[in-house]
């Protein structure tokens, strides 16, 4: 039988540059495998409030 999906968790990515500029932050939700990726994710995603791609870091 197949094993359960307990290794994959849902995380939230939040824009880091919008806070510095005083604009509303953009948030994305995604999943990650906590066994393969133990550190926090940092991805470049589009922020519609700033109308450009910015760094989004994983928050708790």
Curated annotation (Swiss-Prot):
Tagged with keyword DNA damage: no
Highest taxon above the source species: Bacteria
InterPro entries, alphabetized: Ribosomal_bL33, Ribosomal_bL33_sf, Ribosomal_zn-bd
Pfam family for this entry, one: Ribosomal_L33
Keywords from the UniProt entry: Ribonucleoprotein, Ribosomal protein
GO cellular component: cytoplasm; ribonucleoprotein complex; ribosome
Statement: the UniProt record of this protein carries the keyword GTP-binding: no
Signal peptide: none
Example GO molecular function: structural constituent of ribosome
Membrane spanning residue stretches: none
Gene Ontology biological process terms in this record: translation
Family: Belongs to the bacterial ribosomal protein bL33 family.
HAMAP family (alphabetical): Ribosomal_bL33
Protein name listed in UniProt: Large ribosomal subunit protein bL33
Biological source species: Chlorobium chlorochromatii (strain CaD3)
